[in-house]
Amino acid sequence: MSSPTVALPQRLVSLDQFRGYTVLGMFLVNYVGGFVVVPEVLKHHNDYCSYADVIMPQFLFAVGFAFRMTFERRVQREGLAPAYGRVVKRLAGLALVSMVVYGASSPAETWKQLVDLGPLAALAPALKRNWFQTLMHIAATSLWILPVIRAGIGVRLIFALASAILHVFLSWQFNFEWCNTSPNAIDGGPLGFLTWSIPAIIGTVACDWVRMPDSRTPWLRMIVVSTVLMVVGWGVSCGTRFYDVPAERMEELKDVVLAENPVLPAGDQLKYRGLAEAPFVQPPPKAERKWNYWMMSQRAGTLSYLTFSAGFSLLVYVFFHFVCDKLRWEFGLFRLFGTNALISYILHSMVMGAIKPFVPRDAPVWYVAGSLLLFFSIMWLFVRYLERNKVFLRL
């Protein structure tokens, strides 16, 4: 017997607030990440999970939550087949938007070079890197979980587990090394949706829990599940210690980035060397530990990274659910950007492009902070203007 649920409002305050916080976090880390004075924890890294790296999984968590919340309404309103068809068309539209927003680098300088490359080789760099960023991953992941979006929690969790196992297998076959060879993939590349489905499906589960009557809201369960996911993600990342370089081989391997057998370590690599560093703690440099599948890597979309980040996203959302839906607190800045997240995402790259050319990488902290404030102010002006004129971009 399924648990009783309550109808949620058209817009859930906690979800908008959570999304707005995530948008502002994205503004921060995307703007400051290239400056020398900024702490490493605010920068994106390819070999561990920093604060910057937990931002994108929160978007996928919010996508899964909203998808679960709105799709059933659409089915009830339009019928099953029209609802599925409409979602597929909207996801195709989002994929097209992502291709336009991200663009692509030119694969050839002359017509002859383009003809010699052929269509597949010409499109390969864009498919591997340029197009598969946040918006495309949202579209691909949403399409991937669409068959189970109406299923029970158990089915969805099994689907997430199967997707994770498939990602490990394909990474062992080719995908991990492919993502880390030029041109390097972004956010897991074309197969990243397999592990991005983890935070998305946890978002759908959170939606089910929030829909329970107040007296049955499983606060403890949400906190325990978020903690378990974070611990499991960190535990999986401890496999990275198999790839510590012995002291006598550091000089020999100092220029090598990727480990031998980066997914399934060979027998002589299976030596216990202790636990991995905690998330948000920088690991040893590549001369001391080679890159491998078990480290937390946004570039490769690794299992440990997205399992930990799914738990972290759930814990952050629980905070907003309590503060906003139970205590009835609401923060205007989070509401502003949370209700118009897509246009905020598209605009922020343009605004950064107008400001950052005038901020050298080695600028002092006061100059970086001032330019960051200018960036936030311009974004606020643009998005506030759109809100006042009731202009919202949603797909």
Functional labels for PLM-detected ranges:
Residues M1-L395:
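Alpha-helical transmembrane segments and their immediate juxtamembrane cytosolic regions
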